[in-house]
Amino acid sequence: MSDVRVIIQRDSEREERVVTTGTTAAELFAGERSIIAARVSGDLKDLAYEVKDGETVEAVEISSEDGLDILRHSTAHVMAQAVQELFPEAKLGIGPPVKDGFYYDFDVEKPFHPDDLKAIEKKMQEIQKRGQRFSRRVVTDEAAREELADEPYKLELIGLKGSASSDDGADVEVGAGELTIYDNLDAKTGELCWKDLCRGPHLPTTRNIPAFKLMRNAAAYWRGSEKNPMLQRIYGTAWPTKDELKAHLEFLAEAEKRDHRKLGSELDLFSIPEQIGSGLAVFHPKGGIIRRVMEDYSRRRHEEEGYEFVYTPHATKGKLFETSGHLDWYADGMYPPMQLDEGVDYYLKPMNCPMHNLIFDARGRSYRELPLRLFEFGTVYRYEKSGVVHGLTRARGFTQDDAHIYCTREQMSEELDKTLTFVLNLLRDYGLNDFYLELSTKDPEKFVGSDEAWEEATETLRQVAEKQNLELVADPGGAAFYGPKISVQARDAIGRTWQMSTIQLDFNLPERFSLEYTAADGAKTRPVMIHRALFGSIERFFAVLLEHYAGAMPPWLAPVQAVGIPVGDAHVQYLEEFAAEARRKGLRVDVDASSDRMQKKIRTQQKQKVPFMIIVGDEDMHGGTVSFRYRDGSQENGIPRDQALAKLVDVVERRIQV
């Protein structure tokens, strides 16, 4: 046997090793149980891969990002095998890894029942213990069609070879190169137990799956299109250790308690009535108070920063979106047109920027007016697929705190710097403090404008982001078609990351709208345009804050800031007078004068997460005092009325959490 030379890469260390022809990646890392795959000259491979002369081989640990994807993808295969063993009529869809887990789609006669999921999980445990080997096999298109003749969805995927998309998970099954099938082989006999069309790579055996759990099932359209059949999707999660699985399940339990949809109902804040439609929320009085306070504070801060408020309609002629390019690039995300005025197409607006451009262009502009900062709480409508609509965080109708800044190229860097600083400070005012930044750059397949303009815009944004001394993460190809952007990513109280504000530099739309201002030398000049949404949308930010605070909003945002609780009927009038005085100071204070016993009143207000309970008994009435009871159950007694009012006002004005 001849020798081959390979380079083994571990972090920054490189080791050259001479091995015999036919040596596998598994042999290179023999005895290292945490290594479950290899990256060979940049491509992920199974450990069964035979290394070739001159290749660079990197170990893939099960706890790495690649390793977790492989673990979860292999677990999805085990789940699909279990389903077909229990439900032989089930037809296979797609089963990719996703964030923190995996799913697989099945065409079955009836939806899965919770008891079915228990049976499937038990069968998966049996398969895991069998230690079946994952074995890769290259097949021709014709052979694949013959082998998978009873799997109609797999046959469709074979036809996508070379054009499969990551959007629907199809690219985990077929790529641009050779077709492969993964066989699950009996550990002792090598006999075929199950197989699936798949690109891989996979774990060496099913025994390499340390910990998993099935989470739920849901309906899902085949490949995400509502024109396709409805399938049944089972979601699961898999982790390198049982302790990590336990920690993840505890995290999910905490996240479920904080789910804004659950809290929205329990606290009577908002609802999404079926009669109105999916993704279209209505805010109840208490939710309306929170939203109004959020908007009022944002409006005041924007005025202080030199923004000018504008208002635009909800619908427009389609010609406007032809000019902006949205009909070329964004039509799938828009509601269908309404034909009015003898066949003229009108659209609900998905974005505010084209209308703001018309405001800029309504009259001649001078360089002395720049930067011009136009701001609007603008409601937009986007046709999100039903499968991705999620409460207030992914809606079909929502209001953006949308600003468009027009400036000279010389002002561009300073304006971006001011904008990002303003954005971060305003988010901190609402109680978010843990950030990192993401820089989204050009998608080579989907952009307008010149390469030079994109390069200039991207480099300017990079420099502005780096000034903030926050972590900066690259998002290659993630920008919208009209310009690169900075996204502010915020971590909430339980460590989840939310994309919040976006700041997008745009050299394209001023060209499309022929926007001009008169420069100091009298020349007509194109302005630079900056898109900026701080909350993203009011609805989404409302949901993020609700989950961040687990419904216990800080007093300045709470719909009811304090509730008076009388020890007895004789104390109601005293509390009503206190509440009236508090309301005159701008506080939101109620009195619970119901016939319920005091302890029940306290429990009721605790469930409603009211920041302060104002308790009054005989001693308080005679001494001109009140007692504060806080959310954590602690109490402060005998506070003079004036001091109590002053404290409430101070806590609200300073936006302190209690």
UniProtKB/Swiss-Prot annotation:
Domain TGS as annotated: residue spans: 1-61
SMART domains referenced in this protein's UniProt entry, alphabetically: tRNA_SAD
Cofactor section: Zn(2+)
HAMAP family hit by this protein: Thr_tRNA_synth (MF_00184)
CDD domains per UniProt: ThrRS_anticodon, ThrRS_core
Molecular function via GO: ATP binding; metal ion binding; threonine-tRNA ligase activity; tRNA binding
NCBIfam families xref list: thrS
Residue stretches spanning the membrane: none
Top enzyme class: ligase
Function: Catalyzes the attachment of threonine to tRNA(Thr) in a two-step reaction: L-threonine is first activated by ATP to form Thr-AMP and then transferred to the acceptor end of tRNA(Thr). Also edits incorrectly charged L-seryl-tRNA(Thr).
GO biological process: threonyl-tRNA aminoacylation
Subunit structure, as described in the record: Homodimer.
Protein name in the entry: Threonine--tRNA ligase
EC number: 6.1.1.3
Cofactor binding: number and manner: Binds 1 zinc ion per subunit.
Keyword Zinc: yes
